[in-house]
Structure formats: C-alpha cells, structure tokens
Design a protein with these regions (language model features):
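Conserved hydrophobic helix-helix packing surfaces used for dimerization/oligomerization
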Residues: 146-148, 169, 291, 440
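Local cysteine-cluster metal-coordination motifs and their immediate loop/turn environment
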Residues: 44-66, 89-110
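Beta1-alpha1 glycine-rich phosphate/pyrophosphate-binding loop at the start
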Residues: 5-32, 61-73, 78-83, 87, ...
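Phosphate-coordination loops involved in phosphoryl transfer and adenosine-cofactor binding
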Residues: 142-145, 213, 287-290, 356, ...
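FAD-site-proximal beta/loop scaffold in flavoenzymes
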Residues: 250-288, 381-450
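Feature captures the FAD/FMN-dependent oxidoreductase FAD-binding
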Residues: 140-141, 145-149, 197-246, 360-375, ...
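A short, basic/flexible loop-to-alpha-helix module at the beginning of a structural domain
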Residues: 30-31, 35, 127-146, 265-289
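A conserved FAD-binding loop/helix module that cradles the flavin
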Residues: 300-305, 443-471
C-alpha cells in the first residue's frame, strides 16, 4: 500500500453530521463536506493485510484495497475506474449501504476499521464533479430485446449492464418516476434524489428506455412483454409488508411504513396532483401527533427521521428483539456482520427507543381512530415470553409498522406468468437466475428476499450476465465488439 504505517498513525474519521436543530428544518442529506486531505488520509489506513477480507463482506466484490490506495495517492480518476469495474452505482452504496465490508476489514479486528464507505462516496463524487463519468454505449447492437420490470438498484444495474453489452433494454416502472425503493422509500435526508437523476441521464444517453406508470400485470398485460421481448428480468423487489395481526389493527391511523415514507418523498419531489395532497383525510402526517413506530431496523429509523421533520408531539420506537450489545457480540465474530447496537442520525435527533416490547392490542375512540397501544415487555427469543406485571399502555395518534417485508407481491404479474415460488415465497430460480418459465429471469429482493442495496446491485449484474449468455448462446455476435459482463 502507499503508506505502510498509515493504520498506525492515522485515526478513523467520518464526516460530521449537521447540527440536529439545523437539519430538522430541511430534507437535505445530513453530513457536512469532508475535506479532500482527510479523504486521502483515510485511504492511507488500508493495511497491506495480505488477504483483504473486506472482499468477503462486499456482495459486489469491490476492489477495495485498490481504490483505497489510489485515493490516498490522489489518483481519483483511476480510482473511479476500479470502482466502476464492479459497482454501477457507488453513489448509492456510498450513502445507504450499511458497509458490511467494514465489518470484515482486517484492521477492524482490534481497531476501528478503514472508512471504506466514506472513501467510496468520495471517489464517485469527485468523479461526477470532474466530469469523468460519461455514457458508455455499446459499439455494436445485438438485435436482442430485454424487458426489465422494476427500476430499483437491481433492475437499473441489470439494465445498464445489458445495454452496454449491446442489447436493446426497456425498463418498466409502475410509479411515475424511476428509482424504485430508492426513489420512494429512502428519505431525502439519506439520499437526495438528484443523485438518482444524474445516473439516469447517463443510462438514457447509453440507450436505455424507461417506461413509467407501467404496472406489469395490472395496466400492462404480461403478454405485452412475453410476446415482444427475447428475455424478461423481474426486479420488482420484496414489497409485501409484514403485518401486525392484533386486535384493533383495523383502526384509522395505523399505517405501513411504505404508505408513510412515499408520501413525504413525493412532497419533497414537489408533486401537486397526488390524492393525499388534495384530500387531507388521505395524508399521513406526524405533525402534532403522538407517534409510535413498531420495528427497530433501517426502515424504522427512516420513519423516525421523517417523523422528527414533521414536528410530532412525541415519538417512540419499539422493537421486540432485546437490546443489542454495544460491541460486537461473541455470536458474530469477525469477519461476520456483527450483532451490535447501531445508532443512526434519526436516533440522535430525538425520540424514545425501547427494546423487548411486544404489542398486544390497539384501542380507539368512538370514531374509529387509534388512541392507545397496549404492550408488554418480553424475554429473549425464541419464546419471547411475556414478563408478568410488565404490561403498559401508551396514548397514540399515529402508528407506523416497520417490521420488514415478506417477499414479492404474488398477485398480478407473478401469478399471471405462472412462476414457481421458493419455500420463503420469493420467485424461485434455477442456475443462472432463470425462473421456472423459459426466458424469464429474476433478481434482487424479488428473488432473494428483503436485503441490502449492495446485494441488489450484485444480483442485477449477475442476472445481466446470465441473460447475456442466454441471448447470445447461439447468436452470431462478434465477441470483440461486445463488453464482457462480470
């Protein structure tokens, strides 16, 4: 590495978050700029560790030591080339990936790990600023047509890879804007949407076609795809939310996280014609309300940060699992993803966070509005036995359910295509990402279940390679004119 003793001399640093009182007044990303000199210093902490275990934690197999060293030496343009060799969208992972690579960093065995996520974001943002990221259209078209259903990170990664390989690619998105969960599920304070838009401009210039308001299996018949395309990739995500089936669930004021978060993202986009904007009874807002968020994961934290910015009266976040340890648990030794307490920016902003809480029932008023949540403290998993005498009640006006996702929505497209499902309810695939129907492939959360943005990109790239092999197995295409898919 460029500085053999960097990990001994330089401490881990991260960008500071903007002051809570400032960032709660807007929807912009929460981190302050990080000076270039410090970015390079963080790259110097990457050790000459022999076997870089950071690779084992990275689903896209990023060449992490390579671009850490290039960043340290100020070779930013070379760094973005190495970064793009494995990751189509480092600006997404550099913002919303939890960085399992850092959990697997060798330095992290007994010191704070290398700031890999920070360096990744620094490299790609420098590349955008300098104009080093540009369209890469194919030199030759294959004449093959591919439909991609879903425009989240898996669908976008596959679409870009397939187009660069010379195939004609059309992406179908049920919403009115491209981006999937990144567009409508991730709050702006974590991912401002211009970050998505600039990458879409590159993809359009490469020749990818996007069709919005196209819900395949609902307002677009599946035959429109099966009759027209040589291959179809399903990348519609795992959108079926886990419900809380307790008495009182039918009361007004109880909503899934993915009903709440998209509304605010649409407000941030400046939408004017949504039903919830013209009819206040359809709006899900936390302003002046006593809010409870059920679920302690990333989606719950997104609901928490969004709630804070809407000025609630109070907010509680409850999780049925016990409080994680402050440091890596013995049950998840290095280089595994550690079980440990994580504090997001949203938690820093306020609210009460509590663990080992099970919800028993909701009660409401005479108008059918939720007014109370009855809970009990429980013991450890797997039994979660209620602790006698620990029952308590909380007054509430708004409840947000953020308890994860059960898999893809089966009705509509999946049922109409007659696709087989696995034992978890996800779309089943054989070797090479092909489903039970010839020529139809699946990738991302639709195939593997609820997961991370970095896994989605990995799935999209691998599915693209499988589709490319399927389409060109017997095709007369000169290989020297085609971009290899890896």
């Amino acid at each position: 590495m460029g500085k053999d003793t960097g990990f001994l001399e330089i401490q881990r640093e991260q960008p500071t978050r903007r002051k809570v009182e400032d960032r709660l007044q807007d929807w912009f990303e929460i981190y302050e700029p990080f000076p270039e000199e410090k970015q390079r210093e963080q790259g110097a902490r990457c050790m000459d560790c022999g076997v870089p275990f950071c690779h084992t934690g990275c689903p896209v197999n990023n060449l992490i030591p390579d671009w850490n060293d290039l960043a340290y030496n100020g070779r930013w343009e070379a760094a973005i080339r190495r970064l793009h060799a494995t990751n189509n969208f480092p600006e997404f992972t550099g913002r919303i990936c939890p960085a399992p690579c850092e959990a697997a960093c060798v330095l992290g065995i007994d010191q704070p790990p290398v700031s890999i996520k920070l360096i990744e974001r620094s490299v790609v943002e420098r590349a955008w600023e300098e104009g080093w990221i540009h369209p890469e259209p194919p030199e030759q078209n294959t004449g093959k047509r591919v439909a991609v259903v879903g425009s989240g990170p898996a669908g976008l990664a596959a679409a870009q890879q397939l187009r660069r390989a010379g195939h004609s690619v059309t992406v179908y998105e049920k919403n009115d804007r491209i981006g999937g969960l990144m567009r409508y599920g991730i709050p702006n304070f974590k991912l401002e949407k211009h970050v998505i838009d600039r990458r879409l401009e590159q993809m359009r210039a490469e020749g990818v076609t996007f069709v919005t308001n196209a819900h395949v299996g609902v307002n677009v018949p599946v035959e429109a795809l099966t009759d027209h395309y040589d291959a179809i990739l399903l990348a519609g995500g795992a959108e079926q939310p886990r419900d809380l089936k307790i008495p009182g669930r039918e009361l007004k004021g109880i909503h899934y996280a993915m009903e709440f978060l998209p509304q605010q993202n649409r407000r941030c986009e400046g939408d004017k014609d949504e039903d919830f904007l013209s009819d206040p009874s359809l709006a899900i807002l936390a302003e002046g309300k006593r809010v409870v968020i059920i679920g302690g994961g990333d989606t719950g934290a997104d609901c928490l940060g969004t709630t804070h910015r809407q000025k609630p009266l109070s907010v509680h976040q409850f999780e049925i699992m016990p409080t994680p340890p402050a440091q890596r648990a013995a049950s998840t030794p290095w280089p595994m993803w550690p079980l440990q307490l994580r504090t997001e920016g949203a938690h820093e902003e306020g609210g009460i966070r509590d663990w080992s809480i099970n919800s028993l029932r909701f009660t409401g008023d005479e108008n059918g509005n939720v007014k109370q949540l009855h809970m009990v403290r429980v013991g450890p998993p797997p039994s979660f036995e209620p602790i006698p005498g620990s029952e308590f009640t909380l007054d509430v006006d708004l409840v947000l359910l953020a308890m994860g996702f059960l898999g893809p929505v089966r009705s509509g497209m999946i049922e109409q295509l007659g696709l087989a499902l696995d034992n978890r309810g996800n779309v089943a695939t054989k070797d090479g990402y092909m489903t039970s129907v010839e020529g139809i492939f699946a990738a991302g959360d639709m195939r593997r279940g609820q997961s991370l943005v970095v896994w989605a990109i990995s799935e999209g790239r691998k599915a693209a390679a499988a589709i490319d092999s399927y389409l060109t197995a017997n095709a007369d295409v000169e290989p020297q004119f085609r971009r290899a898919l890896v």
